[in-house]
Swiss-Prot record:
CDD domains: OMP_decarboxylase_like. NCBIfam families: PRK00230.1 (NF001273), pyrF (TIGR01740). One of its GO terms (biological process) is 'de novo' UMP biosynthetic process. This is Orotidine 5'-phosphate decarboxylase. Keywords: Decarboxylase, Lyase, Pyrimidine biosynthesis. Catalyzes the decarboxylation of orotidine 5'-monophosphate (OMP) to uridine 5'-monophosphate (UMP). It comes from Sinorhizobium fredii (strain HH103). It catalyses: orotidine 5'-phosphate + H(+) = UMP + CO2.
Length: 234
């Protein structure tokens, strides 16, 4: 796994139009190598945009959080492999993960199991009908992801250290809910700064609003990259 901050920062293109996404990618230029595309942009023509990004040499994390019957998940993953994506999320349910791993075998696609959304706190987990607190549920799903042969998991930085003890050093730990010091949390409830997340064991950081909504996105991304590099090179 690369130790370069540039390979570990994933800018979330949580934007309503392709034109806005293209503007951000153009603004960030060679400073940023990795982008995340989720539902909002995907359903505005973003899947073709994702192909174009990959073809231009950028890495693309397709945040689709797949969950369905085994065959449906497998067929979806097969097509996503053909798109040239670098990362793909699915909910960390054992059968779905196993189907995805089998479908992606032999490719470079890194499959990520989503444990508990970083917008959820303990009460949200209870309200959803789970008998566990978020931390316990994250660790259980991390173990299931490891057993299924997944490439990594998605979890908050708060759980990253404990997750590392379970999955080891080779799997990716991708962390959303990253907020630079002084930034607003927005709809995230379990957040950390870039430096805190790297120290906790996160391998990749997903940052959206603090960059794409910044007055100067390039300066914002460079500040985050510098903070990450300071920890990675220490």
């Amino acid at each position: 796994m690369s130790t370069s901050a540039r390979d570990r920062l994933i800018v979330g293109l949580d934007l309503p139009t392709i034109a806005e996404a293209e503007r951000i990618v153009s603004t960030l230029g060679d400073d940023v190598a990795f982008y995340k595309i989720g539902y909002q942009l995907a359903f505005a023509g973003g899947l073709e945009f994702a192909r174009d990004l990959a073809a231009s040499g950028k890495k693309v994390f397709l945040d689709m959080k797949l969950l369905d019957i085994d065959n449906t998940v497998a067929k979806g993953v097969e097509n996503i492999v053909r798109m040239g994506m670098s990362m793909l999320t699915l909910h960390a349910y054992p059968k779905a993960m196993k189907a995805a791993v089998d479908a992606a075998k032999g490719s470079d696609l890194c499959l990520l199991g989503v444990t508990v959304l970083t917008s959820m706190d303990a009460q949200d987990v209870i309200d959803a009908g789970y008998g566990s607190d978020p931390h316990t549920l994250v660790l259980r799903r991390a173990e299931q992801a490891r057993a299924a042969g997944m490439g990594g998991i998605v979890c908050s930085a708060e759980e990253a250290t404990a997750v590392r003890r379970i999955i080891g050093a080779e799997m990716a730990v991708v962390t959303p809910g990253i907020r630079p010091t002084g930034a607003e949390k927005g709809d995230q409830k379990r957040v950390m700064t870039p430096a805190e997340a790297i120290r906790a064991g996160s391998s990749h950081l997903v940052v959206a609003r603090p960059i794409v909504k910044a007055a100067d996105p390039l300066s914002a991304s460079r500040a985050i990259l510098a903070e990450m590099e300071g920890v990675l090179s220490a």
